[in-house]
């Protein structure tokens, strides 16, 4: 018999209908549907009474639920060595598989089904992570554009500073030559003019130096922000969403 089911499709079929994560301690109800043991306990508080199946709504005896050994064996066989344990909800101890769009926080399937996030718009963590990474890419692009603008500003300031200094040198040389011809009768006037040009030049250069220093500081901060954004992209889904949401809210 040929098998044509991809690993991703198989993983989708091995998910608990309640928490939307791969089965953990799966139990099979009398109706044939399987759920995580923790999900069933959270749904009915205990398994010694009648349980209504969330899939077919058939009322079955919870105490007759047996471990789905075959399903557990398949999941264990497909599990990659070294897979990290998923982060779990502090209320239901189920994997944080969903993101509440209204409250902007990670939740488990039971939080969205029965808890305080009931009826809130929710999105799978993988989808939210992809969306936020797209936002991160857009932010990264904007950062690059800002860096380009700052680089252009720095180049312009450096060019203007060089031009002003060079022009000042030329003007000073011309003035010295002219006043050398007049010698003593105009020495006082020459000194006054030179001082005026020097003072004006120092003022312009000081202003440009200040702008240059500010622009270089802005460039350094943008470079630091770029590094932070690149590090965010390497975080796991949950750390990335927590940190990205914390950064975006500031």
From Swiss-Prot:
Binding positions for Zn(2+) per the UniProt entry: 89, 92, 111, 117
SMART domains: BBOX, RING
InterPro entries: TRIM/RBCC, Znf-RING_euk, Znf_B-box, Znf_RING, Znf_RING/FYVE/PHD, Znf_RING_CS
Keyword Zinc appears in the UniProt entry: yes
Protein name per its UniProtKB record: Tripartite motif-containing protein 73
Keywords annotated in UniProt: Coiled coil, Metal-binding, Zinc, Zinc-finger
Any one Gene Ontology BP term: innate immune response
S-S bridge residues: none
Segments forming a coiled coil: 125-169, 204-235
Cited PROSITE patterns: ZF_BBOX, ZF_RING_1, ZF_RING_2
Positions annotated as zinc finger (B box-type): 84-125
Similarity comment: Belongs to the TRIM/RBCC family.
Gene Ontology terms, MF aspect: ubiquitin protein ligase activity; zinc ion binding
One cellular component term from this protein's GO annotations in UniProt: cytosol
Positions annotated as zinc finger (RING-type): 16-57
